[in-house]
């Protein structure tokens, strides 16, 4: 089946089904988790960014300087609520004065105060983050499929959708899932730009523009993720550009300037608030394996850990698995796992997970083309089924994630 030039085959239908499962997991989690103070904080700050930024000098919202967080998560959380408020006020405007429901201005208050007037607050606030997780899942599948084939893409996506940490962060307002989305996309977009440079010039600009947007949105989500992605993307870009390496520095400079403009726009072009990007300390980091240790010790990640262990052994012992497609995500994994932020509460270990799943998908795809195909086919199915069961048990509260 073809849809406007896009071929929809069995692999695409399987991927769509898996992404639908992830969306269902997110909706179930959202429905069973009540709103808390963190939700209302994101709603308040996000709505203020869209509706009325703080007039206080040096501050962008009445929440202060957002604890060093980026602006993107607040804007994503507040946008649906702001749109609903505008729709309600617009509809109310066409009623007769005596029939108007919002004359008292209650919709101008906080989300907590207007919770009885605003419908579906829980879903409007949290579903955008779920959609970003689904979007990332689609990107993860597409990258893995292009690199490793249908089986590699299916394995990588299956582990992603059944990872309890992904589901947990995809169902609450936070900067981590957006940084995760942006960092993964930025690294592989940089590789795509390097490949585009080998072709006609007409294909350069769209990919460079896409890289600029990816870096800008990632920086608006989390500055450290953008810095890591910029350095890693530039390194992979330079490695792959080959005869076009003279263009790398120029392109990355323009990308950085464009990304800075996007971050400035995310602060509503308020210069005083924008300067906090450079003084807030959100990019300060050091090294620790404590968070990675917690992930490894959690029983809900057993399937992922078994697959990762097997993939590492195969990569170390089998020459056919040691090529750039597998090495690049492994290098990103090794770079991200030991990071932790010292100024703000963050989870760089989470950003490493899509690269881990890409690495596993690549190595397993290699072995599925070898004489050990039946063994790895059985292992792949067992790992995915086990991880799905553990994920659903975690969601139901039967296992501590």
Task: Please give the residue ranges for each predicted region.
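Perimembrane helix-loop-helix junctions
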Residues: 2-5, 188-198, 227-258, 358
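Transmembrane-helix signature of polytopic, membrane-embedded enzymes
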Residues: 12-13, 96-112, 116, 140-162, ...
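Short acidic/glycine- and proline-prone juxtamembrane loop motifs at membrane-interface regions
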Residues: 37, 165-178, 345-349
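Interfacial juxtamembrane loops and adjacent helix segments
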Residues: 43, 51-128
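Membrane-interface helix-loop-helix junctions at transmembrane boundaries of multi-pass membrane enzymes
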Residues: 6-8, 145-147, 151-152, 197-205, ...
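Membrane-interface alpha helices of multi-pass inner-membrane proteins
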Residues: 156-157, 205-222, 333-337
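Hydrophobic, aromatic-rich transmembrane alpha-helices
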Residues: 135-140, 237-241, 300-323, 336-337
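Membrane-interface transmembrane helices that cradle and orient dolichyl/undecaprenyl
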Residues: 145-147, 151, 186-208, 218, ...
């Amino acid at each position: 089946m073809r849809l406007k030039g896009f071929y929809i085959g069995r692999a695409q239908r399987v991927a769509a089904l898996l992404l639908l499962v992830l969306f269902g997991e997110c909706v179930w989690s959202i429905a069973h988790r009540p709103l808390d103070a963190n939700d209302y904080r994101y709603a308040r700050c996000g709505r203020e960014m869209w509706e009325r930024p703080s007039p206080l000098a040096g501050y962008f919202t009445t929440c202060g300087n957002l604890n060093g967080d980026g602006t993107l998560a607040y804007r994503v959380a507040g946008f649906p609520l702001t749109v609903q408020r505008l729709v309600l006020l617009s509809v109310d405007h066409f009623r007769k004065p005596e029939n108007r429901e919002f004359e008292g201005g209650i919709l101008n208050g906080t989300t907590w105060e207007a919770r009885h007037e605003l419908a579906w607050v829980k879903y409007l606030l949290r579903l955008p983050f779920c959609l970003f997780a689904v979007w990332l899942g689609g990107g993860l599948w597409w990258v893995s499929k292009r690199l490793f084939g249908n089986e590699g893409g299916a394995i990588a996506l299956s582990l992603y959708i059944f990872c309890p940490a992904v589901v947990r962060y995809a169902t609450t307002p936070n900067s981590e899932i957006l940084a995760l989305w942006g960092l993964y996309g930025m690294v592989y977009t940089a590789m795509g730009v390097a490949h585009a440079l080998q072709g006609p010039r007409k294909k350069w600009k769209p990919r460079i523009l896409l890289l600029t947007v990816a870096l800008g949105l990632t920086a608006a989500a989390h500055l450290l993720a953008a810095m890591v992605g910029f350095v890693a993307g530039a390194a992979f870009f330079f490695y792959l550009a080959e005869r076009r390496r003279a263009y790398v520095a120029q392109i990355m400079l323009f990308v950085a300037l464009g990304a800075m403009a996007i971050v400035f726009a995310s602060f509503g072009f308020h210069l005083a608030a924008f300067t906090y990007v450079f003084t807030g300390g959100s990019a300060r980091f050091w090294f620790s394996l404590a968070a990675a240790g917690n992930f490894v010790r959690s029983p809900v990640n057993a399937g992922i850990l078994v697959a990762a262990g097997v993939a590492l052994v195969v990569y170390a012992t089998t020459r056919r698995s040691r090529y750039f497609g597998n090495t690049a995500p492994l290098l990103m994994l090794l770079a991200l796992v030991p990071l932790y932020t010292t100024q703000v509460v963050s989870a760089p270990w989470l950003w490493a997970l899509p690269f881990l799943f890409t690495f596993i998908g690549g190595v397993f795809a290699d072995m599925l083309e070898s004489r050990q195909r039946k063994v790895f086919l059985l292992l792949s199915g067992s790992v995915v089924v086990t991880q799905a069961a553990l994920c659903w048990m975690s969601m139901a509260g039967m296992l501590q994630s």
